[in-house]
């Protein structure tokens, strides 16, 4: 079967934003106008097509990125193929955003016209910067009270440090919002309310807005000619680019991430969505426009590139595992090069295992269509893979490659969980393993001492939803303990320890002596090991044993048994025995050496500090600040945002449990907050003593 759409007509993009900026609604409108959805789903009545998990429909927030393929006819009359990923905006699910950005070519960043750039907008924006994803901006909810397009433009500069190229101006705002001015064509688009936004009239720019439109068109031209020498020279000579040249320059600047074209509208009231879709075609990259993906040759370890070309060897990245009630486990993958046929055998180079593709599906939210073949640029769901997890590379067994791995954050909160009945015991283990395979930011472990099952994640909501899914999807009833903070330990001063391990009573003996300097790692939270052995006092083949021994005890610090961060170990001397020394003997010696040293090197307890942003009406500012201070919070600053006040603070996670209830009652439900992990910080000594007493009893 031949390719239906040329690869240059593909647009793989995501929609990213703060919670409640209208992502799912915007995606719903896109599906409606591109003909994939016959009825518009509304988030607040629980019928949105993209939000297909039960909890999403109940809570009105998007948890999993649903991948959807749809089609759109551009201004030139040609059909384009869109692969859209709808991502969650709640901070507990940033891992989903990170995963989808990794496999997209472009993104639309959505802003709420009333709130502008919000904390989670900053977080997802930074994630997109990390992967250098070209972005457009859609200022949504222009019909909302307090909507201010121009303030949002300013906030993009001050808060994100980015350049927004304004492509449209709003006509009216709040309830008076009628349409937009197109600054390229210099005309106005007014939507007809009775047509559900499917029809609009192209009219002249209103008289009272002509001067503003001229001013913003001039700014647009000044910004875009700046990226091209010939265009700059022509502009300085008084020759202005024509409309097609403007579009070409905007496209180039967007793909090179020099600036971000900005549009406006209200998805809920069906205004502004179609021009946004035209802009996706005009300005976001096709798989051909972005640099070839880099990887490591599986055999030679040389760096190689794979281009978006069907004739190159197959390479794809698994970016999401999802449990589907009808098909079982589904692996979502982005094909970077080559083509894939149903039933093909591929190799997972990360696990070094062969996999067979049983079924291949093209997804529309939660409905699906079987396909026989997929090509470079496609995003597909594969059934029948046994070994593959998120971040793995799947490729041609004859030309194996490992594509860049994804990095996943460490969980900051954990809870103990117990099955209610004996029957739930086995089902719970299976359910938790399935859920952990789907979500790399969720971890499951067994406490060695108590035998309890501990689950860890990115926040209270994250773990609530995991427990909820266990009940609904796997029919497992469980009792959940109180949330526990993921504390860490470190050392604060340099200490040299000399340790000899000897066991020479009958049979093969064991002997190893190590002299190691332990100190805080100046380069960060990682563990760093160095060997400065000269003259062979510890033979080369035993040195990995020394490193392994220390690493094996880093998971349990001396104070309260928490994992250790930021330790540097330098092996400076030692001794061995011709017969009795072994890698294992050096492993045992270094393990004991570190245990001894950790107590003497100023061991210190660390706690996760959260970056908290509270948005509150002015009347409650005093109460909110007082309350944050009482939680050992450090106020970093405050600023006005319209009629509200934004308070920024760093607060220990330990003191933020159930904060949402407190904030609601303090502000009569009018204040909101967001919280993201910021850094680990030393615990004050009085609090540390309590924590040690509590956890040492459990060690």
Swiss-Prot record:
GTP binds at residues 17-24, 86-90, 140-143. The keyword GTP-binding applies. Keywords: Cytoplasm, Elongation factor, GTP-binding, Nucleotide-binding, Protein biosynthesis. Transmembrane segments: none annotated. Residues 8-288 form the tr-type G domain. GO terms for molecular function: GTP binding; GTPase activity; translation elongation factor activity. GO terms for biological process: ribosome disassembly. It is found in: Cytoplasm. CDD domains: EF-G, EFG_III, EFG_mtEFG1_IV, EFG_mtEFG_C, EFG_mtEFG_II. SUPFAM superfamilies: EF-G C-terminal domain-like, P-loop containing nucleoside triphosphate hydrolases, Ribosomal protein S5 domain 2-like, Translation proteins. GO terms for cellular component: cytoplasm. Pfam families: EF-G_D2, EFG_C, EFG_III, EFG_IV, GTP_EFTU. Belongs to the TRAFAC class translation factor GTPase superfamily. Classic translation factor GTPase family. EF-G/EF-2 subfamily. Catalyzes the GTP-dependent ribosomal translocation step during translation elongation. During this step, the ribosome changes from the pre-translocational (PRE) to the post-translocational (POST) state as the newly formed A-site-bound peptidyl-tRNA and P-site-bound deacylated tRNA move to the P and E sites, respectively. Catalyzes the coordinated movement of the two tRNA molecules, the mRNA and conformational changes in the ribosome. PANTHER family: RIBOSOME-RELEASING FACTOR 2, MITOCHONDRIAL, TRANSLATION ELONGATION FACTOR G-RELATED. This is Elongation factor G. It comes from Rhizobium johnstonii (strain DSM 114642 / LMG 32736 / 3841).
């Amino acid at each position: 079967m031949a390719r239906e759409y040329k690869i240059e007509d593909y647009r793989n993009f995501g929609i990213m934003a703060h919670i409640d900026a209208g992502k799912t609604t915007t995606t719903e409108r896109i599906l409606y106008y591109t003909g994939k959805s016959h009825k518009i789903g509304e988030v607040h009545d629980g019928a949105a097509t993209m939000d297909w998990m039960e909890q999403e429909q109940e809570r009105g927030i998007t948890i999993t990125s649903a991948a959807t393929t749809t089609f759109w006819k551009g201004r030139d009359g040609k059909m384009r193929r869109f692969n859209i990923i709808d991502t969650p905006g709640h901070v507990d699910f940033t891992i989903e955003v990170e995963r989808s950005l990794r496999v997209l070519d472009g993104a639309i960043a959505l802003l709420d016209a009333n709130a502008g750039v919000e904390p989670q907008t900053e977080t997802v924006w930074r994630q997109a910067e990390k992967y250098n994803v070209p972005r457009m901006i859609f200022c949504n909810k222009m019909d909302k009270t307090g909507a201010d397009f121009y303030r949002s433009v300013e906030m993009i500069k001050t808060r994100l440090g980015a350049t927004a190229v304004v492509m449209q101006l709003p006509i009216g705002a709040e309830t008076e919002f009628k349409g937009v001015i197109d600054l390229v064509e210099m005309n106005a688009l007014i939507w007809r309310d009775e047509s559900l936004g499917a029809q609009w009239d192209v009219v002249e720019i209103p008289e009272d807005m002509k001067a503003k439109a001229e001013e913003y068109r001039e700014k647009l031209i000044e910004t875009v000619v700046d990226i091209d020498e010939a265009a700059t020279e022509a502009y300085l000579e008084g020759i202005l680019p024509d409309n097609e040249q403007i579009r070409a320059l905007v496209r180039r600047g967007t793909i090179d991430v020099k600036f971000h074209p900005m549009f406006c509208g209200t998805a809920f009231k069906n205004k502004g969505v179609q021009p946004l879709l035209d802009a996706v075609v005009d300005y976001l990259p096709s798989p051909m426009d972005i640099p070839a993906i880099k990887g490591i040759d599986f055999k030679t370890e040389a760096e190689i590139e794979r281009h978006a070309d069907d004739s190159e060897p197959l390479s794809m990245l698994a970016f999401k595992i999802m449990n589907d009630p009808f098909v079982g486990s589904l692996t979502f993958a982005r094909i970077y090069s080559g083509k894939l046929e149903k039933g093909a055998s591929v190799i997972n180079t990360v696990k070094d295992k062969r996999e067979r593709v049983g079924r291949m599906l093209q997804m529309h939210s939660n409905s699906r269509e079987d396909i026989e073949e997929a090509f470079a640029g496609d995003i597909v769901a594969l059934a029948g893979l046994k070994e593959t997890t998120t971040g793995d590379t799947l490729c041609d067994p004859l030309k194996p490659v490992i594509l860049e791995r994804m990095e996943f954050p460490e969980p900051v909160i954990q809870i103990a969980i117990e099955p209610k009945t004996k029957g739930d015991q086995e089902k719970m283990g299976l359910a938790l393993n399935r859920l952990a395979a789907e979500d790399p930011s969720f971890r499951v472990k067994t406490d060695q001492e108590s035998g309890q099952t501990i689950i860890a994640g990115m926040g209270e909501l994250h773990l609530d939803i995991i427990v909820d899914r266990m009940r609904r999807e796997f029919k497992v009833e469980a009792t959940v303990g109180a949330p526990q903070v993921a504390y860490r330990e470190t050392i604060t001063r340099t200490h040299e320890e000399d340790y000899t391990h000897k066991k020479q009573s009958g049979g093969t003996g064991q002997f190893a002596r190590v002299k190691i300097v332990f100190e805080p790692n100046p380069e960060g939270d990682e563990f760093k090991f160095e060997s400065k052995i000269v003259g062979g006092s510890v033979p080369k083949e035993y040195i990995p044993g020394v490193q392994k021994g220390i690493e094996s005890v880093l998971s349990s610090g001396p104070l309260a048994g928490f994992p250790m961060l930021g330790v540097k170990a330098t092996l400076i001397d030692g001794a061995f025995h011709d017969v009795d020394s072994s890698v294992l003997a050096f492993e045992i010696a270094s393990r004991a050496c570190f245990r001894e040293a950790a107590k003497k090197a100023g061991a210190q307890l660390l706690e996760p500090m959260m970056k908290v942003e509270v948005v509150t009406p002015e009347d409650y500012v005093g109460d909110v600040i007082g309350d944050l201070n009482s939680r050992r919070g450090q106020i970093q600053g405050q600023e006005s945002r319209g009629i509200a006040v934004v308070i920024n603070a760093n607060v220990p996670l330990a003191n933020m449990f159930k904060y949402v209830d407190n904030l609601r009652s303090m502000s009569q439900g009018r204040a909101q907050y967001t919280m993201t992990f910021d850094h680990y910080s030393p615990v004050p000594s009085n609090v540390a003593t309590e924590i040690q007493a509590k956890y040492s009893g459990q060690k």
